[in-house]
Amino acid sequence: KTRLQTQYPWELLTVKEGTTLLRNPDLVNWVYQAASGSFALPLINVGEWLSDRLDAVAQELGWMLMPSLALSQMRSMRGDFDNIRSLLNSQGIQIPPEARGAYRDLEYERGGFRLYAIMWVLSETSEPEWMLLIALGSQPQAQMPRTLKLEVRDETQPLVTQALSDTNQGILYAQVIGNWNERFWITVTADDEAVFEIPPF
């Protein structure tokens, strides 16, 4: 179930978001379908990433598989994830060599940024768990948003909400642990105006 099936839109949206919604017939139709449960939300299968494959949903949404995150290959990887990884390491976040990930460029009227999703298996016991790390970085040839907000939630509640009032001062990231049956939804807000809802992992 999505939150639209248990709550009214005005309980979930700000006045500004509600105004944007009402001015866009496609969004109104989408909210109606989500609230009535008349369509299935696409699900990104990050388990495929462990085998260096992208599922059809991820491909359609513009996700690009990253090369192995082993340190030896990381140095030659283009983009800014190596910088993000260094900053995460300095904050005590260690990404294991067996981790796999993908990125997706998100753009809006005033600029754009890159969303990285990294996952790895924590345990393969009778109740296996996996880690999902979401990090936001700059996108080549795009103006980075001045402010960013990142929310990760499961089917019932927000799990992590992080905000960065000045993207020049650091990076925004969140990590959650789940079992194989859990799904996580990602919402990113750029400059308090552009809202990106990422289909669940």
Regions found by a protein language model. Give the residues of each.
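Long, hydrophobic alpha/beta structural blocks
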Residues: 1-107
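C-terminal, beta-strand-rich globular interaction domains
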Residues: 93-201
